[in-house]
Amino acid sequence: MDAAHWHQGLGLVKPMEEMLMGANPNPNGSSNQPPPPPSSAASAQRPIAPPAAGAAAGAGAAGAGAGTERRARPQKEKALNCPRCNSTNTKFCYYNNYSLQQPRYFCKTCRRYWTEGGSLRNVPVGGGSRKNKRSSSSVVPSAAASASTSAAVSGSVPVGLAAKNPKLMHEGAQDLNLAFPHHHGRALQPPEFTAFPSLESSSVCNPGGNLAAANGAGGRGSVGAFSAMELLRSTGCYVPLPQMAPLGMPAEYAAAGFHLGEFRMPPPPQQQQQQQAQTVLGFSLDTHGAGAGGGSGVFGACSAGLQESAAGRLLFPFEDLKPVVSAAAGDANSGGDHQYDHGKNQGGGGGVIGGHEAPGFWNSSMIGNGSSNGGGGGGSW
């Protein structure tokens, strides 16, 4: 026996139906009357559709809904050909469009963008054209720099630069050798120093041709590159200097006993014609020779050897002033050279050479404590 019917089996609990019937003995007296059964006329007026027709109508409605759903979805677009390489490996750019009226496409083959209804853009991915523009722009200044350096090396100013800045032609701004500036545009001007040849001329060793080229109308024709080192190396070149004004010996010096050859008057013109050789200092050194009288000149004995040589060396105070013996005067001065060397080793004053004192020692003549016979003395300079 089931547990739900224990009370009913014992008779303790009445069934629910009996309890309800006992509470309401008139079943029709309740306010909630059941609805009347449908009449036959109503059933005749309302036809009942067959179940097969209803199933067909439901299937048609579901098919119409699916068709509208398919039409709403965009059809898969056909791949467009690239206008550059005519490749079909293209794609539509969803997130990189400029406007919806002109959709943007990208070609994976040539890596170019183009817009529908617009022009093809020659801009590759990664900015390659920008790099090309930078390289092309950097080529222009490099070409200009190379042109300027070549113009500077050749030593000529470009026409455009000369027209913009005419000072370049006059001041020689392109010249890198500042020690010897070029004299551009000074051919018509009178030379400032007529006796000094141009240091830039290639004919420095030819004084006559050099002066003619420097002072003539075509002075720039012989101008060449001549550096300071070449000037120092050319010891054999003959560079004349302007004539120095003759200085007479003051009377007070002669009265005091100073026999300075430098203050004596120059020799007469007849003697100058015989002594045509000119030293590197520009004035004749033969004025202090043996025929000039007493006293010793520093460059007196040097003139005998220098008048025979066509090209002498620049004489400075620190050089050895030993006279150069020529072939003609070798016999006359052979004894003097020996005395000169002996006096130089002894450290005394000048020795007597052919009637006059040997050069190279100024201490006896300048100080006055020496004699013409070579007595007394100090260290030679």
From Swiss-Prot:
Which stretches are tagged as biased composition: Low complexity? 23-32, 40-59
Give the disulfide map. Answer: none
The segments annotated as Dof-type zinc fingers are 80-134
The record's GO molecular-function terms, alphabetically, read: DNA binding; DNA-binding transcription factor activity; zinc ion binding
Q: Which GO terms describe its cellular component?
A: nucleus
In which domain of life is the source organism classified? Eukaryota
Q: A Pfam family in this protein?
A: Zn_ribbon_Dof
Compartments where located = Nucleus
What the entry lists under InterPro entries is as follows: Dof, Znf_Dof
Chain residue ranges for the region called Disordered: 19-81, 329-349
Keywords from the UniProt entry: DNA-binding, Metal-binding, Nucleus, Transcription, Transcription regulation, Zinc, Zinc-finger
Q: Where is Zn(2+) bound in this sequence?
A: C82, C85, C107, C110
Ranges of Basic and acidic residues composition bias in the record: 68-79
Q: What is the lineage of its organism?
A: Eukaryota, Viridiplantae, Streptophyta, Embryophyta, Tracheophyta
Entries under PANTHER family matching the protein: DOF ZINC FINGER PROTEIN 2, DOF ZINC FINGER PROTEIN DOF1.4-RELATED
Described purpose of this protein according to its UniProt entry: Transcription factor that may transactivate seed storage protein genes in developing seeds.
| Major localisation | nucleus
- Name under which the protein is recorded: Dof zinc finger protein 2
